[in-house]
Amino acid sequence: MEAYHKPDQQKLQALKDTANRLRISSIQATTAAGSGHPTSCCSAAEIMAVLFFHTMRYKALDPRNPHNDRFVLSKGHAAPILYAVWAEAGFLPESELLNLRKINSDLDGHPVPKQAFTDVATGSLGQGLGAACGMAYTGKYFDKASYRVYCMLGDGELSEGSVWEAMAFASIYKLDNLVAILDINRLGQSDPAPLQHQMDIYQKRCEAFGWNAVIVDGHSVEELCKAFGQVKNQPTAIIAKTFKGRGITGIEDKESWHGKPLPKNMADQIIQEISGQIQSKKKILATPPEEDAPSVDITNIRMPTPPNYKVGDKIATRKAYGQALAKLGHASNRIIALDGDTKNSTFSELFKKEHPDRFIECYIAEQNMVSIAVGCATRDRTVPFCSTFAAFFTRAFDQIRMAAISESNINLCGSHCGVSIGEDGPSQMALEDLAMFRSIPMSTVFYPSDGVATEKAVELAANTKGICFIRTSRPENAIIYKQHEDFQIGQAKVVLKNKDDQVTVIGAGVTLHEALAAADLLKREKINIRVLDPFTIKPLDKKLILDSARATKGRILTVEDHYYEGGIGEAVASAVVGEPGVTVTRLAVSQVPRSGKPAELLKMFGIDRDAIAQAVRGLVTRA
């Protein structure tokens, strides 16, 4: 970035005029919509004008060009001013702004990626900076390109802990290509923000987190130009003192106007007042970027060799995940791994050992880790794999939910699922994760049961759009598949089959192996069962499940190391509901567990081989 040169008076006036046009557009759009946040837009007008028409480098007619500077509107409720910017730049027709929030318009109430200029969906506050950190990390360390990343936050969202997780991350990794703009307009939604206009405290907090922090008058285009022109070898926070509703007579800096459009008669009067301050209608052209981002292809990434496991060998699927990811890393230098300080448990350390420059340690900040991954994945620059204990992904549920709204392609591996982890106890046991990930739109939920299946899951996830979750286990279990076994999403496997099977038993991970052990017990009693491995819990192989059920007198037994709610049993029951003559019996963890040996806990909660065998006997004798 070049050293700061003060713009001449003509440019400064043009920026003031641009800011006022953005104000007018925001007021017009929200009044036409009958809803929206004009006051939140008006506090940011000068910031947005200086950013997009003085500081940033981008191609106005190609918003997703990989060379462009990036912008994240973390305070997503100010979407109308973002849309106004892209109309001012010439990408959107100005008439489209009046379709804000209409069902047939792409201009939603908050930014979403169906808009070409939006990389990540925002509106659930506190998440934009984490995504911006992921973009900046990618720009600095993977692309090694000159594009910069800007993120505007509101003061209300600075109460979110995830913001400070991101602040810490940016400092640790010296993201000097990242600028956060804090729009300190004093007022939150229902009350003033906790610090109101105590700018020095904001500055001290940012500096304490390792940022270069600059206080500016957020309505002075000259001060903003100077602040954006400062170059430091650390991330920069521009702390802008602004006023909510700036330029709206009678409403500026007044409470109780959050999220309220102006009535038409008031809007017309205010627009007339603001228009009177505009000296020229001439628009400022966007400055094009330096074109130094490498071309990237993340399609069709395949394992270099087949799985190197032999049937009967034992390995935990969590370790097989680490080995698979390290292996896939050799197929593409755009495979990256992130972990939350659990890499020696999730085995992502194996990836770090072989590809140290593509491993991102996110420390114990799971919410931020997911946001970082979302940022890294934008514009198809990388294929991220995040790992931690599956239980700890639950604290990032909102980030995962927003990742789906962002149409992000990220892969999450949750280890240590279920009571089978043993002595560590319930705080470490994932028993809700399947329910959580199944509820995410367009998600794919893998639950591999051996090393071969795990390796295939990793490869498939890398090439699958949307949120992919891979559930791995702590216990070592036998390899049951040959190395060339073909796996596909939504395709279950019949692991054990006889002509006279009495019950179809569906298990995954540890419980699949317990089902196979139960089959041996039952065989001595001349009771045969069919054992299915679903491989993906979402989508589920409904056809194979129904075919198997019909071949076993309509009896299905599911067994899972998960709570009853939202897991395999409910997925299977939903798939076969309404099918005549088909019944589903479920075995799952029924209450909060405790510490103990894995075998003791499986037995205590009725999901071990003996419980499966007993349930099968009950189904057979009931006929």
UniProtKB/Swiss-Prot annotation:
GO molecular function: metal ion binding; thiamine pyrophosphate binding; transketolase activity
Reactions the enzyme catalyzes: D-sedoheptulose 7-phosphate + D-glyceraldehyde 3-phosphate = aldehydo-D-ribose 5-phosphate + D-xylulose 5-phosphate
Record-listed N6-acetyllysine modification sites: 6, 11, 144, 204, 232, 241, 260, 538, 603
Binding site residues for Mg(2+): 155, 185, 187
CC cofactor: Mg(2+); Ca(2+); Mn(2+); Co(2+)
Top EC class, one word: transferase
Family: Belongs to the transketolase family.
Protein name: Transketolase
Gene coding for it: TKT
